[in-house]
Design a protein with these regions (language model features):
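Condensing-enzyme catalytic core mediating Claisen C-C bond formation in acyl metabolism
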Residues: 1-63, 178-270, 365, 375-380
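Short beta-strand segments
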Residues: 8, 123, 148-154, 201, ...
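Buried hydrophobic positions in well-ordered alpha/beta secondary-structure cores of metabolic enzymes
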Residues: 7-9, 42, 89, 107, ...
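Conserved beta-ketoacyl condensing-enzyme motif
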Residues: 7, 57-125, 289-308
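Claisen-condensing/thiolase-fold acyl-transfer catalytic domains that form or cleave C-C bonds
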Residues: 66, 70, 95-97, 114-115, ...
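Short, flexible helix-coil linker/hinge segments at the edges of structured domains or between repeats
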Residues: 159-182
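Acyl-CoA/ACP chain-elongation machinery
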Residues: 144-167, 222-231, 304
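Short acidic, glycine/serine/threonine-rich loops at helix termini
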Residues: 19, 100-102, 133-134, 159-165, ...
Length: 380
């Protein structure tokens, strides 16, 4: 690769007003009209105090995922006419607004200031953010493109509405006995929220102000050895395999809540942190990076429970990534899946804390089928 790749600006778009914990079910609804039995436990464990929904209290959608993405992209530019210079748009999302056409097509359709350019969609869960970032990075590094916009967006609240769940989803057992058991039924309804984050990338840095140089992006999948852990549009079988929505009739799809997001919590407990730290150790060694040289670490975590578990495992392995270097805004903006890493980066980039030559490590796990990604940025 001949060209350096730089992040010249960052942005985030959080829809409507922040929603405090006691207002959540006003927006996503109550299953069978009853308050959730696990809500308070899940919120105590995840530590989130506010989040954003692209919803009204009538459970009406105010923004599509494509709209969230386009709003974040527009905030990258002081003048929207500058969008006409963009050569590539890469997008990430866990649950697009539609199956066809692509998410990138719908985002591009909301950016009339752009030209007939190349677009790219990534498919998956949280790691789609770094996948989209790497496509843009490689396109610029190779000389194929001079610049690119990369955006991750999530409209997940619409999939969490009470109308999509039946009363069985409320029957949780062993609440409070084990932190993981409290997650098993409707925990995801109180874990996920909406938003978008974007970055503007170029083969030249800013003339004034800070720029982030992308040193490398590294990812790995464990799907060759492990089954799916988080699914949507499918259902789990007893043997751990999944059955796709294509195998069900319309009544079965409704009865089984096939399109709701589900997670095998026991599988998550067994693997998510251990494999994540394995990956971190591997990429730091591969790229000859000393942990003590890292100035800031942005871990994408779904809850402060996993934040603590990750920190504990890193400390147990004597990896010098001290907590005083960690940065997260999870508790105030919520878990936005693929968008979270860019929204956190945007806040840190604009915080005034960064100094020239600071190194920033981005850490992103994906529990879909246990994939992990890491990126190293340098402030110049």
């Amino acid at each position: 690769m001949n060209n350096n790749v730089y992040i010249k600006s960052t942005s985030s778009y959080l829809p409507n007003n922040p929603i405090e914990n006691d207002r959540m079910e006003d927006y996503i609804g109550k299953i069978e009209g009853k308050p959730s039995r696990v809500k308070n436990l899940v919120l105590r464990q995840n530590g989130i105090t506010s989040r954003y929904y692209a919803l009204t209290t009538n459970q009406e959608i105010t923004h599509t995922s494509a709209m969230l993405a386009s709003e974040a992209i527009k905030k990258l530019f002081q003048d929207l006419h500058m969008l006409s210079n963009v050569e590539l748009v890469t997008t990430a999302t866990s649950i697009p607004d539609q199956i066809l056409p692509s998410h990138a097509s719908m985002v591009h359709g909301l950016l009339p200031e752009t030209k007939n350019i190349e677009i790219f969609s990534t498919s998956g869960v949280c790691l789609t953010s770094l996948q989209a970032l790497k496509i843009a990075y490689l396109s610029i590094a190779s000389g194929d493109k001079k610049n690119a916009v990369c955006c991750a967006s999530e409209l997940v609240s619409a999939a969490l509405l009470s109308k999509h769940y039946d009363a069985e989803y409320e029957r949780c057992h062993n609440i409070g006995e084990n932190p993981y058991f409290g997650f098993e039924k409707d925990f995801l309804r109180f874990m996920l929220s909406d938003g978008a984050g974007a970055v503007l990338m170029d083969n030249t840095p800013n003339e004034t102000g800070d720029t982030l140089k992308i040193e490398w992006i590294d990812m790995e999948s464990n799907a060759n050895t492990l089954p799916a852990c988080m699914i949507a549009g499918a259902d789990f079988n007893e043997d751990g395999s999944i059955t796709t929505w294509k195998s069900y009739n319309s009544h079965e799809i409704s009865d089984k809540s096939v399109f709701t997001v589900k997670q095998d919590i026991r599988l998550l407990k067994k693997h998510i942190i251990n494999l994540w730290v394995n990956h971190i150790e591997k990429v730091l060694k591969k790229h000859k990076v000393k942990a003590e040289d890292i100035n800031y670490i942005i871990p994408h975590v779904s809850s402060m429970f996993f934040y603590k578990e990750l920190l504990k495992e890193i400390e147990n392995r004597n990896i010098d990534l001290k907590e005083n270097k960690w940065f997260t805004n999870l508790t105030s903006v919520g878990n936005m899946g693929s968008a979270s890493i860019f929204v956190a980066l945007d806040e840190l980039f604009k915080s005034g804390k960064l100094k020239k030559a600071n190194n920033i490590l981005l850490l992103v796990p994906e529990s879909g089928r246990f994939s992990y990604g890491t990126a190293l940025l340098t402030v110049i």
